[in-house]
Each structure stands twice: as structure tokens, then as C-alpha cells.
Amino acid sequence: MIPEKTSQRKASKRVFNTTGICNPTEHYMVDLTQRLSEVRKLVDDGKNFMINRARQFGKTTMLHALAEYLSQDYLVISMDFQMQMSDAKFRNENSFSLAFARAFENSFRITEEGRSQEYQTALQAFTEERKEIGNQFELVELFEAISKLCAAIPKKIVLMIDEVDSATNNQVFLDFLAQLRGYYINRSRFATFQSVILAGVCDIRNLKRKMRPDEEHKDNSPWNIAAEFDIDMSFSAEQINHMLLDYASENDSSIDTEQIAREIHDYTSGYPYLVSRLCQLLDEMYQSGMDGAWTHAGILEAVRKLVRESNSLFEDMAKKVKDYPDLGTMLRDILFCGKGIPFNLGTELVSIGTMFGFLKDEDGQVEISNRIFEIWFYNLFIAQDAIDSKTYDAGWQMKGQFVSESGRK
């Protein structure tokens, strides 16, 4: 179905967003209600967990939405290690503990509860303890002060820390996790956080592996008390359809939203950034007056534009392949040779590729996670090998299997 064009289209009230945090008043978004409800169950049960997903997979947006979702019943302290903790703060326990405490205080003050006298009094006691101990304020003292604060206020505290990848290769951060573990185990004796939620690309076991390559400590992570976070954060075709229905309504557009949603999902497998970027490109074509923007032909054009552009996600993917050459070799084998590799997260390359969002489990076999990534990796490797005419010629002949006129493999 070709969308009807009108000369007096409504100005779009919202936009598709691919940078920063999404919020429903400014951006077209999928409905997160069910997902937030599932995460809340973990929080209500007092679980600590890690949201580790690939780059631009909606982690930060999820944390912000979750903070608002929990705010009626919990005091949510939201921190960001990338913004609040520089590398210098990880020099030793004292510098880390002081910096963490100050960041914690700042995040506490901007909460709604932080403006009440009762909460301000409890926070003031925490701050005074930090200042009084000074150079001797280390992790033990930090957690003792946190425990006192937790006991002094009515609401239970949920601590969220985004961008924990910036703590990679810092022993003091692992010691911080060990303190969290100790208080979690002894929570019946000492007041502590209701729940601790960490977010980043790497999981804590991978941080541990990079810190301590020796076998004795390889799998002995202080985060082994964490619950599994297996909530699907990708977008389903149904969720994409509901988002497109909002868009069509606001833009007075007749779009076959179900069909377009299925095609977008077919190319992206619901990878949040890729979904939003394709929609963004389609909207740009539509607003510029292109006939058939929100159609099959429009999607083919948007895909071609997307895989040829430079963006932060693709730049990060190229860097990862360079940093992990064996992973690049495996991707080549899958793309060019059709090599079958059993999916087993105990295999380091499979685990790393899955963590980066490059790979997925498809009926027990390793596959590249979506068609956009297939096309992009294919183009990357062909460009790298262009000097080898045999590789280039063979690859060029295969190109049609990825984007044909029908849009299918």
C-alpha cells in the first residue's frame, strides 16, 4: 500500500531518536510497560543484576524509565560512571570511595525525597562521616556509611550504575563489587540496598577475566550473587507496529504499519538502534516528499543508506573486529564459507561475539544477529580484501543474496 500524501500534513509532534535517552513526550518509542514490570519483579525480590547488552541497545533509556517506574515505592539513586567517575578516581580505595560518595550524594540530592528534611538529615550525616574520616575513607568505611544511611530513611534504596565498562581493568572496582556481595549476603544483619543494577556492554565475569587472566581467579567473580537478567530488550514486530501507528496518526499518513513493521524487524531482528535509524531514514524520505517512502521500496532504499553511512555503532563494530581479529575470522567463515559453529557461550569467541551483539543462537548454531549486520560485515570484509582480486570477485558475485530487488536474501 502506498501512503497517501497530503499537502497539509500535520507537523510531526515527535521524532525518531538515535542519540541519547528516549522519552515518550519527544520521541516515538515502543511500549516499555511489560518490560519494566518484569524488571520490577527482580527489584521487589531484592535481586542484584547486570543489564549487559550491546552498544546502543536501549540500556540507558531503560534505566531512566525504570527509575521513574520505581520512584513511588523506592528511593532510586541513578549514577553514571562515565560521567561521574574519571580514571583518576580508580587509583586506590580512598580516591574511589571519596569520589563515589560525592557522586552518590549528588545523585541523592536531585531525587524528590532528597528535598525533604528527613532525607536531608540522613544524607548530611553521611557527608559529615565522609569528611571527618577523610584520607582514611576507604571501601569499608564507605559501605558502613551507606548501611547507616539505608537504616536511617523510610524508603529502601535502589542503586543504578550506568556505564560500568569504564571501570574495566580497575582492581578497586572489583573490590567494590566484593563489598556489595558481602552486604548482600549479610543483608539480614546489616541495612543495605534493596537492589543494585549495573549496566554496560561487558558483564562482570568478562571484566574479571581481563583483570586476572590466571585460572584461579578467572571465574571467581564477586558478582556471582547476581540474578540472571534474561529479559528480551529487542523490539518485536508487534511493538514496532504500535510505534508506527503512533507515527501514522500524528502525520496523517496511511501506512501499512503491520507490513512495514515486519520488514523492519526482518532486517534488524529488533535491534533498537537499527529499528530507530531505519524509521528515521524513512521519515526523512517521507518529509522530503518522496513517493512511496513508507513502502517496501522505501525500506530497501533506507537499508542501502544505512549500511553505507558512518555512525557510532558501525565505528564501534569496526573497532571491535580490529581488536579481536579471531572474532573477525569467525565472522568471515560464517559469511563467506557458511561454516557451521555450534552455539555455546562457554566458547570464548562465541561469548564475546554475543556480548557485542554480533552473534545469536539460531537453533543451536551461531548466526550473525541480524541482516543489517550481515550486509555491513560483508561490505567491510570485501573492502578490506579488495586488493585480493580473487576474494573480491567471488564476494561480488555473492552480494545479491543479501539485498536483492525483492529485499530478501
Question: Where do the protein language model's features map onto the residues?
Answer:
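Walker A/P-loop-proximal flanking segment of P-loop NTPase domains
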Residues: 1-70, 148
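Winged-helix-like regulatory helical subdomains adjacent to P-loop NTPase cores
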Residues: 2, 236-356, 362-363, 392-395, ...
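The catalytic "switch" region of P-loop NTPases
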Residues: 20-21, 156, 166-259, 266-267, ...
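A conditional alpha-helix N-cap/helix-loop micro-motif detector
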Residues: 29-32, 139, 254-257
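P-loop NTPase nucleotide-binding core
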Residues: 41, 45-57, 61-176, 194, ...
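Short, amphipathic alpha-helical interaction segments positioned at domain boundaries
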Residues: 311, 373-403
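Minor-groove-contacting beta-hairpin "wing" of winged helix-turn-helix DNA-binding domains
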Residues: 365-370
